[in-house]
């Protein structure tokens, strides 16, 4: 571990100050820097530009070397705005990659891509820093235990369960509830699971980042009185930041999570919202560096960049990183190269459906499109597996019958199919659930439903014991007992109206 020249202010060592270059060209966030012969910085080294602009404002811009162009010239990408920079300005080669603070002191704090706190609290009390570029763990260090990670969300736990120490993708277009689902998972896991979390806000809205911070303070995930008791570290590189910052902020969050896994030997949760913005930032940087674009205008290095990030998110013998990543799907097209490349790395996919959101069923998780490698009888048990398969079969049959219903109506179906449709509609509504983080919108208190309760509820619906209950009794409730209580209340209300 070394002193971080990008976050330690004026303390750049005398040795590092010797390797000075100067700016030869500036094109937006990309700088060309000339160094003396034989003193070229390495790829990924951090360069620091210090000085004053034309109105004597202090400038402190950190860049990362991306290309060695020849003729003692390097091309670097800035991690912050380049306003005020001029040709000829002095550039310091720090001699190392970007390094960020790690350890317990990061909990309860908000950082930018450089590991600088941006929450207006005291400086981070740690001398321990770690470089954001490092190799993935060796094969021999990996741990391959299979166990379920309970989330308390019915549709997830039953039909596409998450793996402890696995990678999970939340896929969906704009406005179908990816961020709300991530916030609910953070809330549930912080309450039901003792480990720490790291949240990487990659290229998303600043307002959402602020809302998340406020909600975490309200729920006690971030403890304002005793910040060291907090359970989460936040790293933000928002939409308004240059592409260099958005491309590297995921690595900053991952580096903090790796320290908790490798040194503190903890189970860590890493949330990334949104992994598509990481790809998008890489595409912008690739174009700025003059690379020829690949399919649909994406960077030719898309698979390499994604693999470099994803292979570091893994479980070792020391601890685990369970990663939950929101994946924006451009124009709801799952074959787009960005979501398609992400699919290859995931253990479970939670696909959000615009059709379900339009029906008002939240979380709008598509029960037939969502998948998990964990849904096998030898892992989850026979009862869970059988229930999940029967739920999927019932919903699939309902989907097949929808065209017939639309043209001929329900009356033309056989008795058996009518029963299947009635149960499928109850299942569809029972897959909805009130969220803790959505209490302000729905007015309903949030519900955490254990896996055993979830399985019991769906078995009762499938067995036909609840066929007499109205389908609206199953909408936005927690466990099955709440549904039967709601049905009784609805019946009483109807009797009063009569």
Swiss-Prot record:
Record has NAD as a keyword: no
Bilayer topology term: Peripheral membrane protein
Source species, domain of life: Eukaryota
CDD domains noted in UniProt: ATP-synt_F1_beta_C (cd18110), ATP-synt_F1_beta_N (cd18115), F1-ATPase_beta_CD (cd01133)
Assigned EC number: 7.1.2.2
Entry's localization field: Plastid, Chloroplast thylakoid membrane
Primary location recorded for the protein, binned into one broad class: plastid
Summary of the function given for this chain in its UniProt record: Produces ATP from ADP in the presence of a proton gradient across the membrane. The catalytic sites are hosted primarily by the beta subunits.
Subunit annotation: F-type ATPases have 2 components, CF(1) - the catalytic core - and CF(0) - the membrane proton channel. CF(1) has five subunits: alpha(3), beta(3), gamma(1), delta(1), epsilon(1). CF(0) has four main subunits: a(1), b(1), b'(1) and c(9-12).
Membership in a protein family: Belongs to the ATPase alpha/beta chains family.
Name of the featured protein: ATP synthase subunit beta, chloroplastic
Protein encoded by which gene: atpB
